[in-house]
């Protein structure tokens, strides 16, 4: 055992990653006026491909004054990343009154979206010509973080949620999300700032309001985002009223996101319902209030661009899930599960954070080599989560799979596991080899809403030979797994000199059963089965040494295999 653990240590220690700094923006001018609308700057950035190999990621934002001076006003601003068809806010700040400043923001929670080619957007809500020169850098610090795998899911995101006006009712949607079985930590990461002044209670910039966050219908957190410390701002002195405390921000400072725990109220493997309920408030100083009287109810009932502006909240939030193993950030994740070439079938794995009402995709056959007189064909899908939900799974000769609820069928609820099994018809096919992958995915949610998706890596048929004139092995044998150590999968080959009942099971070193790969009658021949490092619930297992126990009749043999992540 010490020998194998030494191999693991050597492989880990031989992989070296160094600290890395990525310059995303370098003095990019944000302004509005004669130079045009340059309040937003969008750039494509190349981040490290393996962001899980860094213990922390820090975003540094620096503001400088262009020729003519800085914007004299405090402006809300944010940095966002485009990921799987949506923008995700990773940091917010408010500019100072007319002076230069800079901040560091911990963005380690966004490691899963800060990798490879990334589209980054910088926005400042400036309306004047001078504006700002914006520089943004990311510092990646090498090492293993506490949570190397993180899921990021958008929750409530509103650029302008009007507050206290019954003619513009607040409509914050209820959101349901799934927590994977291997969740180690989960929380709501929320950033709320209030804006507008000259209203009842001077809302929403200068009014201290507490909003409720509900988990599964019960108040889990009272959201207190008031900033009582603006006079201690490091970015000082400034011009203007920077010392006054505000709702969620201070001029010339970053806006710290708040992390609100979830696992105290819901367990992994369950669907969680989230609500955000604002404290009751009525703005009597609104032009939409028929009872408002100038100089009586308020100084002025009309909004203007100076002392009386509409109260609203600027809300950004995500569900952050730290897991033992890697998961997708998309609504739907489809992959071809571990492939046993002796079964002549393909298992389709589905992980979905939201309810799925329909899905279609195609098995790409272009990379398969087929030899023989027959044609590869498929049978409609059976078993799995689709069948449990009374769905039908149909497939045509080109590999197009359509899975739909029929009649009394229900949507597939959030969760993870095998969606369906597709049987391959291999009559008169002697050799089938190559790779198979999922393409052309379309997934729909409630009322036909298009769902985001990602797909897994292609699965490879090492060799599937159905020729009846095969050479029969002379003895039963279990071969060493290859590759070993492995990640993400290994192939376990075995020889059958006669027809027999076969059991092949993976155990950990404590003797706990991890996964039964085979437990059925097999005919004589050279065979193999693949293990992708998943347990019986199709959940990824951790790095370590495992035992592969093979039994065919009275023959029994054990091999060690090593999973590295």
Predicted regions located by residue number:
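C-terminal tail/sorting-segment detector
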Residues: 516, 521-524, 529-530, 539-565
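Glycine-centered coil/turn sites that cap beta-strands in beta-rich domains
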Residues: 342-351, 355, 465-482, 486-507, ...
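Short strand-edge motifs at loop-to-beta-strand transitions and within beta-strands
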Residues: 173-175, 418-422, 525-529
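Acidic, low-complexity intrinsically disordered segments
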Residues: 327-470
